[in-house]
UniProtKB/Swiss-Prot annotation:
Residues 1-24 are annotated as: Disordered. It catalyses: S-ubiquitinyl-[E2 ubiquitin-conjugating enzyme]-L-cysteine + [acceptor protein]-L-lysine = [E2 ubiquitin-conjugating enzyme]-L-cysteine + N(6)-ubiquitinyl-[acceptor protein]-L-lysine. GO terms for molecular function: ribosomal large subunit binding; ubiquitin protein ligase activity; zinc ion binding. It is found in: Cytoplasm, Cytosol. Belongs to the LTN1 family. This is E3 ubiquitin-protein ligase listerin. HEAT repeats lie at residues 65-102, 106-144, 346-383, 424-461, 508-547, 612-653, 664-711, 789-825, 952-989, 1005-1042, 1053-1090, 1129-1166, 1216-1258, 1269-1307, 1330-1363, 1364-1400, 1500-1539. A zinc finger (RING-type) spans 1697-1744.
């Protein structure tokens, strides 16, 4: 493969030393790394750098023999350059240390320091981290064994604590703490023990090494080397700081002082103070800080004092947050340690500019680090330190600069924490300076003037500016200003004011504040911001705390005490001492402000908003002072009444919130009045106010404690005006759902000790009537829950002490009762609220607060009837209604002490609640008849009891079912007995005192009406189960049926005497044989305890008992019908010939026939038959033969050729069951039938179809419809048998039978059955009540219609004048639009069966017209597809709206309207028939059909609609095959018959079909579309459809069994190619057809290989075939066939057409037949017609003579 020359293989684990010459040279260097300080001279010089000096320890070449080879390998890998190798070696070393004992590890300990010193400063941070992990483990394991090597490790170990990579530093710190964790002094002891090594290590790094010397022998980039050097410098400086911190308390530091003396004397050490890397700079100043802190080391740094002072003050304005704290620490220590600290400095040039810049720039956003140092710094500034600068000039400049930091707007703004710390420092310094001046008793006048100037310039001036500013500093500045003023005030009170300085300052402050506030607020228009800031200032002054809360500074108040700087602590707030000025100056200021605001509020009466904003401020101000004197001062009159009137006068012009504030003020003033005047003012003034909002506020106050306890207030609340107010509020709550108003209404119902409430009964009635309004409104919202909960909460109150009128209480009860019945928890109604409402009226009944008389009971029953008769009810609603009705029955009667009267009242109540016109006996019977007919039509049961009418609409069934479910559920809840709790030994299961017996309220006695109601509901339940099995119901209706059925099953499983009574009544009713449903109800007995215990065997045991009892009693009909219902649940062979029923001879034929039918179903459904089963077959055939013989003598026995409606019901059922038995035997055992039986079947069928023909008009007659279905099904069974027999060899008997059928019976029977079906479904008006039965009748017949022989039908209609072909087509087209799916599918099937006959006629007509030049103009008017034209036009109008909303844009897909499934399926079924007609037609006729479609542009809407109907997910992902293409696969006929077939799936199937069978039609449409639509269709077809069609077509070509003479075809599926070879004699022609990726949308590629006749001929053939495959709706094989036929004709000598130059025409597939009389050349008719049209001449294309 090339590359480098293969070298000798590497030894495993690199066990051998490196052979590299460069590596050997480096490893061979013998210069040691750690020279120590032994070579250091007294002068402090170091060993000069010499060649070969390396910063890293030299790794050993050889190892001690005691070290294992594996360990040696690991150690060698530690010295490699590759970081990955070192990391793996460290991991291996870590594992080795974990697994080895201490004795083994002692061998490597002498080597470890050398490796550690090298690896701890490795450029790769993960290597450093892993190194520290190894050291941690090694120290933990070896402990004292490491002592000899400690001095070598500690300097680097401590330096690693400050590694810039946090994980490595953390591990090093943790390992050091863990190792020396014995006591608190261990770290100091270690530092002192290794002091020489630590200082030498740090000094060497700081003064000797460079980036180059630290990286000798390492292949590092300059950047990596520099980073390593910086890490070492930082760690060394921090190491020294740590060392000084640990050894600060040590007395003997001579060696340390010597080492530090050497270090600070070296000029390179001082260079780090100006290093560009902030971390190095910060570490250096930190180191200096620790030196200055140490008293012992102060002498070491003193010689460099000048240099150090200049450095520190040079960087006093450093902006770096890491560096600045250390610099300022050094500055403060310099000021503390050296009295002459200022001597080296030029204050004007060095200090002042930098300090000013720092202050003005907001401390360079580093305030938190610098500001705490300002006060200590300022305290050390004296007049002497300022040299020639006046100290007060310095102070003024200092505060002016700092004032900018306080008031200046910074961009971006300062952080909140920075603002706080700057303000703290500002006011600390101000207070300090003021206190200094105050403490100076010998002060001069200029000092006082300076203090006044500070107050003006640095406090009052910023306040004046901030009042009008939007600065973020407003609040914090006002707080500090207030604290400063409060401090002065307290100092005055404590008599610490020397020379009245503080008093003068305070006086000046208040004068200026009064000026500022009054001047600013006296303007006509006052800014909202200004108003807010004034209020904020006043609030801060009111709450001013004299103690300056600062965690860093403590101010002493005595003149002789010192200012200290303390460590930061958490501030603890003390009890606030109110400043004396609050009740003096501040109070006057507040009074002034309130009066100003009141005046402005009155002036702004025209503007409610303007007045309201002043009221907010007034309310805030009045909260500060609320004594009588304060309020009297607010008006010129100076009394409280004037103040009240002034505030009340504002109420009419304010907002709601402002009014609330005014009312609060008013009710603060009112208690200051005398009692009589107070209530008089409320009643005569306040209660007369017209504003609704104000009235609400007043009522809220009056209804609240303590006013509500006043007798005068109670009297006010009873007044008519107050009553109207409360009623209005109740009405408003219903509308706006206001919580405040609702709370006010709740207050009205506060009960006193006597049970009375605050309002009278009339007011209560009005509230209740208003609040119950939402409970009866159809529109549901939050008001329902609010009002319902409110009424439920106050109901106990209003029912006691006659707090409301009786008729209102009853009205409210009815509303609550109806609400509980009607509603379930919803979005607008919580479960808790519904529970409150329900328990409310229940408690009212139980406590006798509400009594149910006859009128009330009638009203309650009316409510139940109204709700039960409403729209479709949900299952949970019905259950809730039943629960409420049951509770109503119990609660309304539980207080009747006389048991007899109580039971009598329960019966009356139940009768009233359950009686309904929705569920009468006649309706239940009609429902039974309806469902019995449905089930009998299905064939699962015999309608053995006569009935004349089965009409019942679904709209009538649903109310009946709902009411039955409601009634049964109600009774169920009243009579169901829960099993007693089981005794267990578990103490947790013991019954407690609060145990509630669930059977306490269960009815123990039942009257006859209750039992009759139960039985009737059970009948409805059994009938409904039949309805569910036979019908397709909505999910809600299905759920209703299942709930009723489950309730009945649960009831029948209850162990109570009532169940025993019901069981006995059910058996009695069944024995009477008066109803089919009575027989069905016997199946409910299997849920009784005696059968239910056997679970799956319950049905078998029940059948055995029924068989014995019913046959013994002679109830044979009952037994047979019950057997039919139980049959699906019985095991195989549960019925045999030895069963009791088989020993009877019933007079009715149907009983015996039904028993044999059941025998066959029960014995022959298994996989294995026994020998005894043949006896059943023989017995059944014998029974059939006997009935046939009886028919011979009794002609009217089996109703041959009669009108069924006129026959007795019982006799018709006999015939129906006999026909069903014939059908079943014919399906199962046709070869057991004798010639007599076959004659009976054929003759009987031919006669019965005549009876059907005569009776079809009376299909609504139950027995007639049953007879029709039986005859049709017998025909289907016979045709299935005959068709299967024709496919195989058969006996002579059967051959003769089939031949006789075909010749004598088939035509007539087929035609009669078709005409009967035609009459049954053509323009029939069906009674709405019979619609379901009619649909069931068609469901049974339509599958039979598919078995008709449509050749008879087509021939009949072709020659008949009553039902012509036009009638037939229109009939089938209309059925495509039928609402019944089976009818539509039957129509599709019929059209498919008729299509070959229509096509055959069109072929004949086409051939006749092909001779004429006018063929194209005549044929299109008469072909088969022309019959579709009217219906295509109708459907186009229906689908247009769907096409308009979809223009192949992805953005449209989420907004598409759902497609009407019925219309869409009908339309697609119509096109399915059209596609089938084109597919069944030959190429020539197919061209005519498709031209007709194209001329009328029908395919455009159809194909567009197909895409509109496809799944949205596929349309969204049309550009990539995200989903499976299974949805586009062809549907079988059985799949298409599925009534639940999705429309999207059928649309995809049709798209594939039309592409497969009419590709040219789709291709032509696609080519004409717009580019967006074209790309969309192309992508979808390529991704989902093309692969399916290509694989099918190629597979079809490969699987062709017939072989063409002279042509051989080969398929290459992988490349989508078809290779065709035509060979005759020596000539050979080749053709390669390649399918496009988007085939059949894209044209195929035709390549001609060897051709007879040269290149021109080859090109001609290719073009002809390409044109055919592109423009004709044929398959690839059709094109190959045409190509082969053309060649055949050529070789046969047939002359080609001189227009298209082919022998066979591409569309008509005809030979050239039209001959020119002049030149004798032959032409195709369509070619010649096209020539005439395009040339506008009627001349021969060759000789130009008139044709």
């Amino acid at each position: 493969m090339g590359g480098k020359t293969k070298q000798a293989p590497r030894t495993k684990n690199n066990a051998k030393p490196s052979s590299s010459s460069r590596t050997a040279e480096l490893l061979g260097s013998s210069t040691p790394i750690f020279v120590g300080f032994s070579a250091q001279t007294d002068g402090g010089g170091l060993v000069p750098f010499a060649p070969g000096f390396a910063s890293a320890e030299q790794m050993p070449d050889s190892f001690d023999a005691a070290i294992s080879p594996q360990t040696q390998i690991i150690l060698r890998k530690l010295s490699k350059k590759d970081p990955m190798t070192k990391k793996k070696a460290l991991q291996e070393l870590h594992e080795l240390i974990e697994q080895s004992d201490v004795e083994v590890l002692k061998n490597i300990l002498p080597l470890w320091p050398k490796y550690y010193l090298n690896l701890a400063s490795d450029p790769e941070h993960t290597v450093r981290e892993q190194t520290q992990t190894v050291l941690q483990l090694l120290m933990a394991k070896c402990k004292k064994a490491m002592a000899p090597y400690l001095k070598l490790l500690v300097p680097v170990w401590l330096g690693s604590r400050f590694d810039t990579y946090a994980p490595a530093a953390s591990i090093a710190s943790q390992s050091f703490r863990d190792t020396f964790a014995g006591n608190a002094n261990r770290s100091r002891e270690v530092c002192m023990h290794c002091q020489v090594e630590i200082l030498e290590y740090a000094t060497r790094n700081l003064t000797f090494h460079t980036a180059a010397t630290l990286s000798i022998g390492k292949s590092l980039t300059p950047e990596d080397a520099e980073q390593k050097y910086q890490r070492v410098i930082i760690s060394s400086l921090k190491l020294l700081s740590f060392f000084m911190g640990q050894t600060a308390q040590t007395e003997e530091l001579s060696q340390v002082k010597e080492g530090f003396g050497t270090l600070v004397a070296h000029q390179k050490f001082w260079s780090f103070a100006k290093h560009k890397v902030p971390a190095i700079k910060a570490a250096w100043f930190e180191c200096i800080y620790h030196i200055l802190q140490s008293v012992a080391l102060l002498d070491v740094i003193t010689p460099q004092k000048t240099q150090l002072t200049n450095l520190c003050f040079q960087f006093i304005d450093d902006a770096d947050p890491v560096v600045a704290p250390h610099i300022w620490g050094c500055v403060l220590l310099l000021q503390s340690n050296y009295v002459d600290w200022f001597v080296p400095l030029n204050i004007r040039k060095t200090l002042l500019p930098k300090l000013s810049s720092l202050l003005q720039n907001g401390f360079n956003r580093n305030a938190q680090a610098i500001c705490p140092n300002l006060l200590p710094f300022l305290s050390k500034v004296t007049q002497a330190s300022l040299q020639d600068l006046d100290i007060y000039d310095f102070y003024q400049r200092f505060f002016d600069d700092m004032k900018l930091a306080v008031t200046k707007k910074f961009d971006p703004p300062l952080s909140k924490s920075d603002c706080i710390v700057i303000h703290n420092a500002y006011f600390e310094c101000l207070r300090f300076l003021m206190q200094q001046i105050n403490n100076n008793k010998q002060r001069e006048q200029k000092e006082e003037e300076f203090s006044f100037s500070l107050l003006d310039n640095n406090v009052l001036e910023p306040i004046a500016w901030l009042l009008k500013s939007d600065s973020t500093h407003v609040k914090i500045f006002f707080q500090h200003s207030s604290a400063l003023v409060a401090f002065w005030d307290r100092q005055i009170n404590n008599r610490l004011d020397n020379g009245d300085l503080y008093a003068k300052l305070l006086n000046k402050f208040w004068i200026r504040i009064f000026e500022l506030v009054t001047q600013d607020l006296s303007a006509e228009e006052v800014n909202e911001q200004l108003l807010g800031h004034v209020l904020l200032l006043v609030q801060d002054l009111h709450m001013a705390n004299p103690s300056l809360e600062s965690p860093s500074v403590k101010f002493v108040e005595g003149p002789n005490e010192k200012i200290e700087k303390s460590e930061p602590t958490t501030p603890v707030k003390k009890a606030q001492e109110a400043a004396a000025f609050i009740q003096k100056e501040l109070k006057q200021l507040v009074i002034k402000l309130v009066r100003i605001c009141l005046d402005k509020a009155n002036k702004g009466s025209g503007s409610g908003t303007s007045s309201s904003r002043y009221i907010e401020q007034i309310r805030t101000l009045t909260k500060m002072f609320n004594d009588a004197a304060f309020y009297k001062s607010l008006t010129d009159d100076g009394d409280l009444a004037s103040a009240l009137n002034k505030f009340v006068s504002l109420l009419g012009q304010l907002s709601c919130q402002a009014c609330e504030s005014v009312v609060e003020i008013v009710f603060e003033i009112l208690p200051l009045l005398e009692t009589g005047k107070r209530f008089e003012y409320i009643e005569n003034t306040l209660m007369k106010l017209p504003q609704h909002g104000v009235q609400n506020l007043l009522l809220h106050r009056l209804l609240s404690y303590p006013l509500c306890a006043e007798a005068a207030v109670r009297q006010m609340l009873s007044g008519p005006e107050t009553c109207e107010m409360i009623a209005r509020i109740a009405e408003e709550v219903v509308v706006d759902n206001d919580r405040e108003k609702l709370n006010l209404l709740h207050k009205c119902f506060f009960q006193t000790d006597t049970g009375d409430i605050l309002i009278n009964a009339k007011t209560v009635d009005k509230i209740l009537l208003s609040m119950c309004g939402p409970l009866e409104q159809p529109v549901v919202d939050d008001a329902v829950e609010v009002c319902g909960s409110f009424i439920a909460q106050i109901m106990p109150v209003i029912c006691s002490n006659n707090n409301s009128s009786l008729h209102v209480r009853q009205h409210i009860f009815l509303k609550l009762f109806k609400f509980s019945l009607e509603h379930r928890p919803e979005d607008y109604l919580s479960e808790d609220t519904l529970w409150e409402i329900t328990t409310c009226w229940q408690d009212g009944l139980s406590s006798k607060d509400i009594e149910i008389d006859d009128d009330m009971l009638k009203c309650c029953a009316g409510i139940v009837e109204e709700l039960a008769n409403s729209a479709e009810l949900k299952a949970d609603t019905l259950d809730g209604m039943a629960e409420a009705m049951a509770k109503f029955v119990i609660c309304s009667t539980e207080n009747i002490e006389d048991e007899y009267k109580r039971l009598e009242r329960i019966d009356e109540t139940l009768t009233a609640l359950l009686e309904t016109p929705l569920k009468t006996t006649d309706k239940v019977q009609q429902f039974e008849n309806h469902c019995v007919l449905l089930e009998a039509l299905h064939g699962s049961v015999t309608a053995g009891v006569p009935f004349e009418n089965a009409c019942l609409s679904r709209n009538e069934i649903l109310p009946l079912l709902q009411r039955s479910t409601l009634n049964f559920s109600t009774i169920y809840k009243l009579v169901y007995q829960f099993p007693p709790p089981q005794d267990t030994n578990d103490p947790e299961d013991e019954l407690t005192e609060d145990y509630c017996d669930p059977n306490a309220d269960v009815l123990k006695k039942w009257n006859e009406p209750l039992i009759a109601e139960l039985l009737q509901c059970i009948r409805v339940a059994g009938t409904a189960e039949c309805w569910l099995e036979m019908s397709v119901l909505q999910s809600s209706t299905e759920e209703l049926v299942l709930i009723l059925s489950e309730k009945v099953q649960s009831f029948m499983g209850n162990s109570s005497d009532l169940v025993a009574i019901v069981k006995e009544r059910l058996q009695q009713a069944a024995v009477q044989q008066s109803s089919v449903i009575d027989c069905r109800l016997l199946s409910y007995l299997r849920f009784c305890p005696q059968y239910a215990a056997f679970e799956e065997s319950a049905s078998i045991l029940l059948h055995e008992d029924l068989s014995e009892n019913l046959v013994t009693q002679g109830a044979l009909k009952t037994y047979v019908i019950a057997l039919q219902f139980l049959l699906p649940k019985l095991s195989q062979k549960a019925i045999t010939l030895s069963s009791a029923i088989m020993g009877t001879e019933p007079p009715e034929i149907w009983v015996k026939a039904a028993v044999f039918h059941a025998l066959l179903l029960n014995n022959f459904e298994g996989d294995v038959n026994e020998q005894t089963d043949r006896n059943i077959i023989v017995s059944a055939v014998q029974f059939m033969t006997s009935i046939g013989e009886r028919q011979a003598s009794q002609k009217d026995l089996l109703h041959y050729n009669v009108e069924i409606q006129r026959q007795p019901y019982e006799s018709v059922i006999n015939t129906v069951e006999f026909i069903k038995l014939l059908t079943e035997v014919l399906k199962r055992f046709p070869y057991e039938l004798s010639i007599k039986n076959w004659d009976a079947i054929r003759i009987g069928l031919s006669s019965w179809v005549l009876s059907v023909s005569k009776s079809i008009a009376q299909y609504q007659d139950p027995k007639t419809s049953l007879f029709i279905v039986a005859v049709y099904e017998l025909f289907a069974a016979l045709i299935d048998f005959i068709r299967s027999e024709k496919q195989k060899s058969s006996t002579e008997l059967l051959k003769n039978m089939i031949d006789e059928w075909d010749s004598l019976f088939a035509k007539e029977v087929n035609l009669v059955l078709f005409k009967s079906y035609y009459l049954l479904t053509h323009e029939v008006s069906v009674d709405p009540g019979f619609q379901a039965c009619y649909e069931a009748l068609l469901e049974q017949i339509t599958p039979v219609i598919e078995r008709l022989d449509y050749s008879f039908v087509y021939s009949f209609c072709k020659s008949n004048s009553n039902i012509t072909l036009d009638h037939l087509c229109n009939f089938l087209f209309k059925q495509l639009y039928s609402v019944q799916h089976s009818v539509r599918l039957s129509a599709v099937h019929s059209l498919r069966q008729l299509t070959p006959h229509f096509v055959a006629d069109d072929i004949e007509l086409n051939e006749k017209q092909s001779e004429s030049l006018d063929a194209s103009t005549t044929i299109c008017k008469w072909h088969f597809l022309n019959r579709f034209e009217d219906y295509l036009t109708r459907y186009d109008a229906l689908i247009t709206k769907y096409l308009e909303e979809f223009t192949f844009k992805l953005s449209e897909l989420d907004d598409l309207e759902p497609i009407d499934r019925h219309n869409a399926l009908s339309y697609l079924f119509l096109w399915d028939c059209i596609i089938n007609a084109c597919a069944k037609s030959p190429v020539a006729l197919r061209a005519v059909y498709t031209n007709w479609l194209n001329d009328n542009k029908y395919e455009e809407n159809f194909l567009h609609f197909l895409f509109r109907a496809m799944p949205v997910d596929i349309l969204k992902n049309h550009g990539a095959k995200v989903h499976s293409n299974g949805v586009y696969k062809e549907l079988t006929w059985s799949q298409q018959k599925d009534r639940h077939l999705p429309l999207e799936r059928y649309a995809c199937h049709l798209y594939t079909e039309v592409l497969r069978k009419l590709p040219a039609v789709v291709r032509r449409w696609w080519n004409a579309t717009q580019s967006r639509q074209k790309n969309f269709i192309d992508n979808l077809t390529t991704n989902y459809v093309s692969s399916l069609i290509c694989s099918e077509e190629l597979k079809a070509i490969a699987n062709r069994k017939e072989k063409h003479e002279n042509m051989q075809v080969t398929v290459h599926s992988s490349t989508r190619e078809v290779l065709a070879v035509y060979a005759i004699d020596e000539a050979r022609m080749e053709l390669v057809i390649t399918l496009a990726p988007n085939y059949p949308l894209g044209a195929v590629k035709v390549e001609c290989g060897k051709q007879i006749g040269g290149r021109a001929s080859s090109r001609n053939v290719g073009m002809q075939l390409t044109i055919f495959l592109t423009h004709q709706n044929g398959t690839i094989y059709d094109g190959l066939t045409m190509w082969k036929n053309n060649l055949d004709k050529k070789f046969e000598g047939v002359e080609e057409c001189y227009v298209c130059y082919t022998v066979i025409h591409q569309e008509t597939c005809q030979l050239p037949k039209l001959t020119c009389k002049t030149c004798k050349k032959k032409f195709h008719g369509p070619c010649l017609y096209k020539w005439f049209t395009t040339s506008s001449k009627s001349t021969c294309p060759i000789c130009r003579n008139v044709f």
